[in-house]
Structure formats: C-alpha cells, structure tokens
Amino acid sequence: MKPNSLALIFFIGLITLAGQACRKPAGEGGTSTIRGKVYAFNLRNGVKADSGYVGDIRVFLHFDDHPWADEETRTSYSGDYQFKWLTKGKYKVSIISECDTCPMEQTGVFENVEIKKKNETVTAPDLIGYY
C-alpha cells in the first residue's frame, strides 16, 4: 500500500471514531420532552372502589436500560407529568404500585418510550397503578 492510502484509511477511521464519541446517550441535555399520565385504581379490601387519573404520585425516568431511576417527578392534580430537556434515545417511565400478592406488597409498572428526534414531545402510554 502507498503511504497516502494508509493515511487516508487512518483519517477515515479517526473521523468515524470522533463522530461516535460526539453522540449523546439518552439523558439530559437535549430539547425533547416525555409526558404522560398516571391512572389509578383505588382498592378497598381487594375490591376496586374507585378509579381515575391521580395526583401526587412519584414517576421515575430511566435512561437507556438503567434499572435505577435517573430522574423523578410527581404528577399534578390531574395525573399529568413531564420530563423536559432530554436527548434522543430510549427511556422507561415507571411508578411503584401496590400489589397484594407481591413481595413487600409493591411492584414496578413500566412503559418504554423512545425519543427519535430533537425538539420532539413524546406522550407515553398511561401508567396504571393500584393504591
């Protein structure tokens, strides 16, 4: 191979690596938003007594496939929540729900969400819990 060919291959490889290093993972620092609502069933003695969108519920945001919560917010009085300033990527939103048959009588409820472009507002499916 000629020295110029080796230099060209090296240069192309360097540009490829630099481009990948500049990509942001899912998380903060972008211009997109995830929003959604929390719907709850009120249980009394194991019977559904009431239901509706509910306020003051903790909602967690997980970046990529993190098992831990990277961000947290609470729902408004109408059950709405949002996470702002996010980059493109895959996320999960979750709540903790009561569960009579689960360990510690609670379980996680998760929904997958993907932001595909900048300045996008994505509406997540309702998170449905029992309280």
Outline where the language-model segments fall.
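Short Pro-Gly-centered beta-turn/loop motif in secreted/extracellular proteins
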Residues: 82-90
